[in-house]
A protein has these predicted regions:
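S-adenosyl-L-methionine
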Residues: 1-46
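Conserved class I S-adenosyl-L-methionine
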Residues: 47-57
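Conserved SAM-binding loop of SAM-dependent methyltransferases across substrates and taxa
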Residues: 58-70
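Conserved SAM-binding motif I beta-strand of class I
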Residues: 71-76
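Conserved SAM-binding loop
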Residues: 85-86
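Conserved SAM-binding strand-loop segment of SAM-dependent methyltransferases
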Residues: 92-102
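A short, conserved alpha-helix within the catalytic core of class I
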Residues: 121-134
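Conserved beta-strand signature within the Rossmann-like core of class I S-adenosyl-L-methionine
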Residues: 138-149
Length: 175
């Protein structure tokens, strides 16, 4: 294999894994540790929580949540980022990283809070998934979004660029 072919192949793979993912979810944007820690302090993340990160990237949110005592589960569709995240989190028993599309996954029963990088185009999808999960699990679920506030529902709390939404389970129609 020629060196130029190898370079082109690497760039094509990187484009596929990083570029095309944007059409399915948010782009990979690394989170700043100090901002995440301040947000977790503000919103009171702790050892009774299970945080699910939709689009967990390199796993920094998961590892910080674990330091707060929370169990953390990350869904990521980019296999390169899953590998990096698993490597960086390998010694942390409270961190789980799944190579899976979060849009098609069922949130675990233990979920208390979902973390997402907010992209306005995904608002209705996120709201629908969280409401369905709250109904299925029959408990309130929190959604902590970094970035743009939602346009169609109000945040229960806001801290800097973080917006907290709470989804209450709706009563079944036959109840």
């Amino acid at each position: 294999m020629s060196p130029s072919f190898a370079i082109v192949f690497i760039f094509v793979c990187l484009f596929v894994f990083f570029g095309l993912v944007v059409f399915i979810g948010a782009p990979y944007v690394p989170s700043h540790k100090k901002d995440v820690k301040r947000a977790f302090d503000h919103f009171g993340l702790g050892d009774l929580d299970t945080l699910v990160d939709i689009g967990s990237g390199d796993g920094i949110i998961l590892r910080i949540a674990s330091r707060y005592g929370a169990r953390s589960i990350g869904y990521e569709i980019n296999p390169i980022l899953v590998g990096i995240s698993r490597l960086l989190s390998r010694r942390d028993a409270r961190v789980t990283i799944l190579l899976q599309n979060a849009w098609t996954a069922n949130l675990p029963q233990s979920t208390t809070i979902v973390y997402a990088f907010a992209v306005n185009r995904d608002e209705s999808k996120l709201v629908s998934i969280l409401q369905q999960a709250a109904n299925r699990l029959q408990k309130p679920l929190k959604l902590l979004c970094y970035g743009s506030p939602f346009k169609h529902i109000s945040a229960a709390d806001t801290f800097e660029a973080y917006h907290l939404y709470i989804f209450q389970p709706l009563q079944p129609k036959n109840a």
